UniProtKB/Swiss-Prot annotation:
GTP binds at residues 224-229, 243-249, 268-271. This is tRNA modification GTPase MnmE. It comes from Actinobacillus pleuropneumoniae serotype 5b (strain L20). The keyword tRNA processing applies. The lineage of its organism: Bacteria, Pseudomonadati, Pseudomonadota, Gammaproteobacteria, Pasteurellales. Its EC number is 3.6.-.-. Belongs to the TRAFAC class TrmE-Era-EngA-EngB-Septin-like GTPase superfamily. TrmE GTPase family. Keywords: Cytoplasm, GTP-binding, Hydrolase, Magnesium, Metal-binding, Nucleotide-binding, Potassium, tRNA processing. GO terms for biological process: tRNA methylation; tRNA wobble uridine modification. One of its GO terms (molecular function) is GTPase activity. Its cofactor is K(+). One of its GO terms (cellular component) is cytosol. Exhibits a very high intrinsic GTPase hydrolysis rate. Involved in the addition of a carboxymethylaminomethyl (cmnm) group at the wobble position (U34) of certain tRNAs, forming tRNA-cmnm(5)s(2)U34.
């Protein structure tokens, strides 16, 4: 017989209510032994919880859910009693005296729900993300993922790929038919539509991953431009040493902050210039390492030294070296000295913000700009959350789709196109768990709470 599992569903410690959750074929047996009666499904019962000798341990509400109409898809019993940890421990010990019942592993309830097709893998991960959400928008986005919004987009992509595979493999299997599916343009048109659809989901998923994990923002610029002062202004404390000596910051400084609950990882770097000092050279190389891995770059410019219009010429080499996928916001600092007014404008395709890191004038404009860059919305609407593994799977799918497009348009190689499409389907199916290794499942569910 399959194991029946039990765990505390409420947080460890003192609380008003404490809940124990039991899932498996012996859930009704627990009800008979601890409550003294079988329970009707979906009916709340106020009953005493009894020890083996009939002594009352606690009293509270008992709920029974008959398989498959439960979270896990199995018989589920919930005992909702008083929230003292000692009481819950005694009741848990009592339940474990029943043969065939054991303590649940971390995330095992959600794992059973996944294995019993009550939710897919992306939805299961959304449970943990909902619990860990640090902002209202992250919570709403996690809920959308739990309700299947992300999964639906992935399933639509999988359906498109299956449609393509059907026609490609028909062209391979029936080469003598009058219609040449590979040459008539229909497959290429549908393939292009699928690529556009996938790129849209990739963009949303990247935004969702930033919302979940935080945006990596690197402050870059020449020495003494005010990078460390801006780090301190955003952090709300003296996280970095600030002096008038150019090159004070020689290593990478990191500060984790929240703006209205949105997580950001702010990184201050060494000033970018031609350096003869060996230590400073190392610091500049580390600065470039961070810049190339950033989600967003703040390019600090001293407003007392150059005009706003000159930055593109002055920083042409920097902008050329920077990966085009990384957004850059130009910060004209020290407006308290240059006499410029604080403000935000679009200039030559870049967002430019005028502020003073020293007096903090204009810093709130930057905060709002960073929030919007992370996908913050003041309305209750939002996207879905995504994880790094989702981004990797989508990236893999995109690479195979592009290769498939080349096989079709340049070589008319149906067999190779079919293989690339198969790899696309496998990569996408990893997200929802239709095609997933046991090791990956173990890693995902082991990060959950015990009672989830």
């Amino acid at each position: 017989m399959k194991d029946t599992i039990v765990a505390q569903a409420t947080p460890i410690g003192r609380g008003g209510v404490g809940i124990l959750r039991i899932s498996g074929p012996l859930a009704q047996e627990v009800a008979k032994e601890v409550l003294g009666k079988e329970l009707k499904p979906r009916l709340a019962n106020y009953l005493p919880f009894k020890d083996q000798d009939g002594t009352v341990l606690d009293q509270g509400i008992a709920l029974f859910f008959k398989a498959p109409n439960s979270f896990t898809g199995e018989d589920v019993l919930e005992l909702q009693g008083h929230g003292g940890q000692v009481i819950l421990d005694i009741l848990l010990k009592r339940i474990l005296t029943i043969k065939g019942i054991r303590i649940a592993r971390a995330g095992e309830f959600s794992e059973q729900a996944f294995l019993n097709d009550k939710l897919d893998l992306a939805q299961a991960e959304a449970i943990a993300d909902l619990i860990d959400a640090t902002s209202e928008q992250a919570a709403r986005s996690a809920l959308k993922s739990l309700q299947g919004e992300f999964s639906n987009k992935i399933n639509q992509l999988v359906d498109s790929v299956i449609y393509l595979r059907t026609y490609v493999e028909a062209a391979i299997d029936f080469p003598d038919e009058e219609i040449d599916f590979l040459a008539d343009g229909k497959i290429e048109g549908h393939l292009n539509d699928t690529i556009r659809q996938l790129n849209g989901v990739r963009k949303e998923a990247k935004q969702g991953a930033i919302l979940r994990e935080g945006m990596k923002v690197v402050i870059a610029g020449r020495p003494n431009a005010g990078k460390s002062s801006l780090l301190n202004a955003l952090a709300g404390r003296e996280a970095a040493i600030v002096t008038n000596i150019a090159g004070t910051t020689r290593d990478v400084l990191r500060e984790h902050i929240h703006i209205d609950g949105m997580p950001l990882h702010i990184i201050d770097t060494a000033g970018l210039r031609e350096a003869s000092d060996e230590v400073e050279k190392i610091g500049i190389q580390r600065a470039w390492d961070e810049i190339e891995q950033a989600d967003h770059v703040l390019l600090m410019i001293d407003s007392t030294e150059q005009t706003a219009e000159a930055f593109k010429t002055e920083w042409a080499d920097f902008l050329a070296k920077l990966p085009q996928s990384i957004p850059v916001t130009v910060i004209r600092n020290k407006v308290d000295l240059s006499g410029e007014a604080e403000g935000l404008q679009e200039l030559d395709g870049f967002t430019l913000i005028r502020l003073s890191a020293q007096t903090k004038v204009g810093v709130d404009l930057l905060r709002e700009h960073l929030k919007k860059s992370m996908g913050y919305q003041s309305s209750t609407e939002g996207g879905f959350l995504a994880r790094r593994r989702h981004l990797q799977a989508l990236e893999t799918a995109a690479e195979h789709l592009e290769r498939g497009h080349i096989q079709l348009t340049q070589f008319f190689a149906g067999e190779l196109l079919a293989e690339e499409l198969r790899m696309v389907q496998n990569a996408l199916s990893e997200i929802t768990g239709q095609f997933t290794s046991d090791d990956l499942l173990g890693n995902i569910f082991s990060s959950f709470c015990i009672g989830k």
